[in-house]
Amino acid sequence: MGIFPGIILIFLRVKFATAAVIVSGHQKSSTLSHEMSGLNWKPFVYGGLASIVAEFGTFPVDLTKTRLQVQGQSIDVRFKEIKYRGMFHALFRIYKEEGILALYSGIAPALLRQASYGTIKIGIYQSLKRLFVERLEDETLLINMICGVVSGVISSTIANPTDVLKIRMQAQGSLFQGSMIGSFIDIYQQEGTRGLWRGVVPTAQRAAIVVGVELPVYDITKKHLIVSGMLGDTILTHFVSSFTCGLAGALASNPVDVVRTRMMNQRAIVGHVDLYKGTLDGILKMWKHEGFFALYKGFWPNWLRLGPWNIIFFITYEQLKRLQI
């Protein structure tokens, strides 16, 4: 009979141990659930909404930038002619020759791009910052730049197919045929998955530069204006900060942006090699065939777009942040 108390004792020990493991597991699960519920979803949603508003408001300027950047290519007969002398000339000529709707050629994939790119970019940027520092006062330029570069690369890579279609629709204007979904399918059927991610490297490089410059410059400028007592957390502060970061972003990103635009606009043709094999190759070829300042083609519309785009975006974003949701 002495064996039964031993068996019972072992059984009870196993049951208590199992119960302890289960309780511990529930506690860890509860902690994890609490941490997950603590993740802030607002930067993702607000970033996407503000990006869509800013994109729609500045799209015609972005279209003229694309037209200016693709023209004058001595090694691509489709865009060899220099049709536009500048941003305003391009706006008036496109309106006169193609109609007002041509100024919004590519708006559908552009808004789709911002719905994905803008949402992911701002959400990841804000989330990464909170991983490094808990308080806004502890943020530094270096930390913000690292977070900006990472969020820019991830978001632009995911949204690349919409960028490809947008640029092709902008470049061809009223000559572009087909719907947005049909055009995605056509690119995939004719050029494969590679076609949808054509130019993804310079796109990610540009995004790393733009986001890695714009968002940190905005945050640091805003922080300085508020902490120094020059301005409070007002719309004027948001305006000055966004204008400054737009100029900084345009200066830093324009050369890569020109190459990216041309790489996305070139098509895969059997028996032909790509005109530009990569960012560095594109920059060197443009410098050689068109001169150094070709790298800053479309700079004024680029800045005049990034300036108003950032102003609209950040003011909209800051106002959304104040909503009691």
UniProtKB/Swiss-Prot annotation:
GO MF terms held by the record: chloride transmembrane transporter activity; proton transmembrane transporter activity; solute:inorganic anion antiporter activity
Solcar repeats: 42-131, 139-224, 233-323
Pfam families: Mito_carr
Gene3D superfamilies, alphabetized: Mitochondrial carrier domain (1.50.40.10)
Keyword entries, A-Z: Membrane, Mitochondrion, Mitochondrion inner membrane, Repeat, Transmembrane, Transmembrane helix, Transport
GO cellular component labels: mitochondrial envelope; mitochondrial inner membrane; mitochondrion
Membrane topology: Multi-pass membrane protein
TM ranges: 38-54, 112-128, 145-165, 199-215, 240-256, 298-315
Localization annotation: Mitochondrion inner membrane
Tissue expression remark: Mainly expressed in brain, particularly abundant in cortex, hippocampus thalamus, amygdala and hypothalamus. Highly expressed in heart and kidney, but not liver or lung (at protein level). In the nervous system, expressed in cortex, basal ganglia, substantia nigra, cerebellum, and spinal cord (at protein level).
Function: Transports inorganic anions (sulfate, sulfite, thiosulfate and phosphate) and, to a lesser extent, a variety of dicarboxylates (e.g. malonate, malate and citramalate) and, even more so, aspartate and glutamate and tricarboxylates. May catalyze the export of sulfite and thiosulfate (the hydrogen sulfide degradation products) from the mitochondria, thereby modulating the level of the hydrogen sulfide. Also can mediate a very low unidirectional transport of anions including sulfate, phosphate, (S)-malate, citrate, L-aspartate and L-glutamate.
PANTHER family assigned: MITOCHONDRIAL DICARBOXYLATE CARRIER-RELATED (PTHR45618)
Subunit-level organization: Homotetramer.
Protein name (database record): Brain mitochondrial carrier protein 1
